[in-house]
């Protein structure tokens, strides 16, 4: 109901953004509040999303046994539970973090529940693009909890995680193609075909690789992050290009792209948490002049 896998993934990205901004000077109370508060907000969004999606979930093999579909738990109870989680999560962020971190959490929540779940997912091929913003909010909330300002580092994180969401989501849409088609959800592979979806996956991974490299180039992380982002992004890109091989098994290929997307973003979140740059260190761009 609250999708623990999604919550855990967001915890890693929140921690990555927080520790990147903290630069070794970690306020444990603030970090814990950011992690718990954002996790509750994400859990709230997932629970309410299940209420909204119960009609289309009934048509999909992957989701047809959710409690909101089977009636095991009344929809009203799930909705009340989700709202309670949201109130608690936003309250923690309001009490312990700052206005900017709270604002990003609120905007991300509204976009996911109000814009994506209620309308875009069902009606537009651009639903994935809109939803990618919400998926990119957690590391920015973690980062802004420390800094209290929207600087270049926060902007890079927002763009980087938004770009990552696209090939990750398109890969899911390919290996779950039959589910999305049955529910008449206009994700890119269903609405415009596999060829276009494959192209978008490759292009988004390429741009993601370039944007990820901006963190070390702008002085927010060091050489270790640059090495990890180059290695993982190039491997992911090479894997995506295999989709153009003659006779490729699209289901298997999409699962590989999806699986490595999780490895990539986890590796980058952990590395940026450890390889932050302190003020006395020079950005990589200044070292190559």
From Swiss-Prot:
Membrane topology of this protein: Multi-pass membrane protein
Residue intervals passing through the bilayer: 4-24, 28-48, 66-86, 99-118, 124-144, 155-175, 199-219, 221-241, 256-276
Pfam family, one: UbiA
One GO-annotated biological process of the protein: heme O biosynthetic process
Gene3D superfamilies xrefs: UbiA prenyltransferase (1.10.357.140)
Keyword Transferase: yes
GO cellular component annotations of the record: plasma membrane
Principal EC category: transferase
Subcellular location: Cell inner membrane
EC number(s) from the headed UniProt entry: 2.5.1.141
Pathway the protein takes part in: Porphyrin-containing compound metabolism; heme O biosynthesis; heme O from protoheme: step 1/1
InterPro entries hit by this protein: Protohaem_IX_farnesylTrfase (IPR006369), UbiA_prenyltransferase (IPR000537), UbiA_prenylTrfase_CS (IPR030470), UbiA_sf (IPR044878)
Keyword vocabulary terms for this entry: Cell inner membrane, Cell membrane, Heme biosynthesis, Membrane, Transferase, Transmembrane, Transmembrane helix
Catalytic reactions of this protein: heme b + (2E,6E)-farnesyl diphosphate + H2O = Fe(II)-heme o + diphosphate
Miscellaneous comment: Carbon 2 of the heme B porphyrin ring is defined according to the Fischer nomenclature.
Family stated for the protein in its record: Belongs to the UbiA prenyltransferase family. Protoheme IX farnesyltransferase subfamily.
Job description of the protein: Converts heme B (protoheme IX) to heme O by substitution of the vinyl group on carbon 2 of heme B porphyrin ring with a hydroxyethyl farnesyl side group.
HAMAP family assigned to the protein according to its UniProt record, in alphabetical order: CyoE_CtaB (MF_00154)
Name of the protein: Protoheme IX farnesyltransferase 2
Annotated source species: Shewanella baltica (strain OS195)
Species lineage: Bacteria, Pseudomonadati, Pseudomonadota, Gammaproteobacteria, Alteromonadales
Gene that encodes the chain: cyoE2
